Amino acid sequence: MQNSGAMKRRCWTGDDAEPLMLAYHDEEWGVPLHGDRELFAKLVLDGFQAGLSWRVILNKRARFLEAFDAFDPERMARYDRKKIGQLLRDPGIVRNRQKVAAAVSNARAFLAFEEREGRFGVFLWTFVRGVPKQNRRRSLRELPARTRESDAMSDALVERGFRFVGPTICYAFMQAVGMVNDHLLTCFRHAEIRRLSLPPLPKREGVRGRGPR
């Protein structure tokens, strides 16, 4: 008898993928994320991915969290040359000077944004009007590298001092944090993500303490 995991159809990873990639596809990718700090952390990681595969970043994610103080923007904004030097000697992360410098700069841009404009998550979600876009793609060939929305997000972030936030990075970010549902229709997660994106049902007024009959 086949186990339930083997019967699931996935879009961009298969049953033979390493456990971290399977778990990321099945539990994280495309789940709507709204927290300001969580979105900032994901944006930083996606910046480190530039030119690399997500598998590389995922395998280093735990060390990234340790090395960058759990992506706490207040701490990151205070990183000095000594701390940056330590990061560039850490084999557990991506040791790219421009990307490390951009992560620190982005922490400062994030804090400046919070002070001037408020909620970072609310701002990012405006590029899909606050509601996840439910795409209906049947092939990986249909997935775009960038869209008008990711172009607009990139422009807005660059204008506010963020770096390593090009349109392609922004679209990968939008896919990952559930702003768009890009699981293929044939993937078991498409319907699950769609249900997660639905607004909660309104509470019924005036009925208390009555169970099913």
Describe the predicted segments one by one:
Residues 1-199:
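HhH-family (HhH-GPD) DNA N-glycosylase catalytic core used in base-excision repair
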Residues 203-210:
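Glycine-biased, low-complexity coil/linker segments
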